[in-house]
Amino acid sequence: MNLLEDTLKSCPIVKRGEYNYFIHPITDGVPLMNSQLLREVATKIIKISDMDIDKIVTAEAMGIPIATTISLYTDIPYVIMRKRKYLLEGEIPVHQETGYSKGELYLNGVNKGDKVLIVDDVISTGGTMVAIIKALEKAGAHIKDIVCVIERGNGKEEVKEKTGYDVKTLVKIDVVNGKVVIL
């Protein structure tokens, strides 16, 4: 059984302007986050990732439940790149631009030489991932692996082109005729 694919195929689509947004528990936290789905996603990420790491890194907000679940399974701590400053010593700000927003992300709690796994809910334009990578490089961290649950658009290619890193994903989708299609 593949709960991730099953729930994607049946998730609602909302049109905003010319863009079709899929509304799914992994990417939006609504309509309902199923614990079985979260466990499935976390175990699949663990299986395909280099887990010789010191920390799991994600961006707020929807990467948080994924990173938390992986942390609970592995006893590896996680760090959240936040959208607001905390003004802690060593805080690293980085500019983020996606297809629908821009702003700053702030990294705390990652040290030079830390081996990290980056996880996130979705990659579409690659803007968030490029920002995370830049902040981690500035911190002197060693990025061991990058995994996003859902791939939509050309974000993987953008990340590879701009940073040299490959991004693994669990499922690639598109929205066609008002429905999610697994590619």
From Swiss-Prot:
CDD domains: PRTases_typeI. One of its GO terms (biological process) is purine ribonucleoside salvage. It comes from the Archaea. The keyword Glycosyltransferase applies. It is found in: Cytoplasm. The keyword Glycosyltransferase applies. Keywords: Cytoplasm, Glycosyltransferase, Purine salvage, Transferase. GO terms for molecular function: guanine phosphoribosyltransferase activity; hypoxanthine phosphoribosyltransferase activity. InterPro entries: HGPRTase-like, PRibTrfase_dom, PRTase-like, Pur/Pyrimidine_PRTase. It is an enzyme of class 2 (transferase). Homodimer. Catalyzes a salvage reaction resulting in the formation of IMP that is energically less costly than de novo synthesis. This is Hypoxanthine/guanine phosphoribosyltransferase.
